[in-house]
Amino acid sequence: VVPHDGLCLLSVHAHPDDESSKGASTVARYHAEGVRTILVCCTGGEAGDILNPAMDTPEVRADIGAVRVAELKAATDIIGYDETVMLGYRDSGMPGTEANERPDSFAQAPLDEAVERLVRVIRRERPQVILTYPDEQTEYPHPDHLRVHEISIVAFDAAGDADRFPDAGPAFAPSKLYYSVWPAERFRQIHAKFLELGMESPFSEERMSRLTRDDPFTTSIDISGFDDVRGRALKAHATQVDPNSPFWFGLPPEVLKEIHPLDLFRLAKSRVGPVDVTEDDLFAGLR
């Protein structure tokens, strides 16, 4: 791999496994091109349920935090992240749970404190491009996912302002901020393909009826040659992903590749041009 001089891509995610389900193949592609790739994982995933029956043992439950960090290391090695930074918060769980009320949870952290931690990473790593979550998350409104959006938006602006968080390093203004999106149309295509192949779809008709909003996107990244990365990285999260799950692995790889040849993103903020663009490169306008 020949490093691209100075190009850096930073992804902000809520929990271990989010980096695998969202944009993993894109990160793998840019890493292979020589772009420096940085993951910021905001929590340790301590409140997550064990979703793979084979991993649901007393030993794993007793040490779930350490297990999930080890899974994260395995997944990031598969994807090709050059560095992983843990932001240091505890998984907030869902509203109304004990985990959500803990003072060390991400959801309870003062916004400025969490933003400063992210700003510190941005100023140190100097990424031109940041990937994060959209503001619209009705399909899975986890408090930590919502908070990832909040801190990313503020940190994108604050990192370049020398008057904000002056102790967090020399100011650096990233150029572009993207949302990782998964339009409802893609869910509909996957659901239809299950039915076409005579297979039971993991998506209920009730759930499909709720998928009414199609996230707009500006940027389509060709993941040819890297389309298997997402599945391999997901399987590294053995507590969270059942390798027999029809949701993740029900369709044959060649069929999924046909439906999902591109990772999709929406340009939300840009210092190098308008955001209403059509692109096939996250670094468009930067090289």
Question: Residue locations for each model-derived region?
Answer:
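Active-site rim/loop-helix segments in enzyme catalytic domains that contact anionic ligands
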Residues: 1-125, 254, 266-269, 274-276, ...
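Metal-dependent de-N-acetylase/amidase catalytic core
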Residues: 1-12, 97-287
